[in-house]
UniProtKB/Swiss-Prot annotation:
InterPro entries assigned to the protein according to its UniProt record, in alphabetical order: ITPase-like_fam, Maf-like
MF-aspect GO terms: dTTP diphosphatase activity; UTP diphosphatase activity
Protein family per UniProt: Belongs to the Maf family. YhdE subfamily.
Active site (UniProt): D87 (proton acceptor)
Name of the protein: dTTP/UTP pyrophosphatase
């Protein structure tokens, strides 16, 4: 199934993600789109393969999402438009921090990130006219040292859940970040510079 955007202009691409942040970022650069709700495969997030580099892992998961979306698109006989997928992963000491399973997991991740620098890898994959285009942005983020009471209040807000690394830089956790080097929109979940470059390389005009 698909959900049309509220924008009056006809959609120019499919977004294989239900993330409201990714939707907002696409609309921010004038890209009307339709959210393609692709049935998720069984199980949780795709695990990192033994020996697989974090950058390769996030690239693979974005590619898999795009390819599943393309297959679903064809199975539903929907109009053929470019299809965009993305994946974001937080990396600390070479270890992938995915979405927290529960409050204890969120507290564990946030405590590990406190006072330290980590990386956010954001991959985008575009399927268009039988070709796959992909790229990854890598951003370094430093969090200030956080008090246990702050972590508890943050978890009380509900914001950590459903987010890689248990935080969202565009929300309350923005006050935790002391330094960022790279793509702010990549940390949000969709690196706009890389996304626009992929679209242009596929011959799709970007405002």
């Amino acid at each position: 199934m698909s959900d049309a955007t509220l924008a009056a202009d006809p959609p120019r691409l499919y977004l294989a993600s239900a993330s409201p942040r990714r939707r907002e970022l696409l609309l921010q650069i004038g890209l009307t789109h339709t959210v393609l709700r692709v049935p998720a495969p069984p199980g949780e997030d795709e695990p990192q393969h033994p020996g697989e580099a974090a950058c390769d892992y996030v690239r693979r998961t974005a590619r898999d999402k795009a390819e599943r979306g393309q297959a679903w698109l064809h199975s539903q006989q929907l109009p053929d438009l470019p299809l965009l997928a993305a994946d974001t992963t937080v990396i600390l000491d070479g270890i992938v921090l995915g979405k927290p399973a529960d409050r204890a997991d969120a507290l564990r991740m946030l405590a590990a990130l406190s006072g330290r620098e980590h990386e956010v890898h954001a991959a985008v994959a575009l399927c268009h006219q039988g070709r796959l285009y992909e790229d990854v942005s890598i951003t370094r983020v430093r969090m200030r040292a956080l008090e246990q009471a702050e972590l508890q209040r943050y978890c009380d807000s509900g914001e950590p859940y459903g987010k890689a690394g248990a935080y969202g830089i565009q929300g309350l956790a923005g006050a935790f970040v002391s330094h960022i080097a790279g793509s702010y929109t990549g940390v949000m979940g969709l690196p706009i510079y890389e996304t626009a470059a992929l679209l242009r390389s596929a011959g799709i005009a970007v405002p």
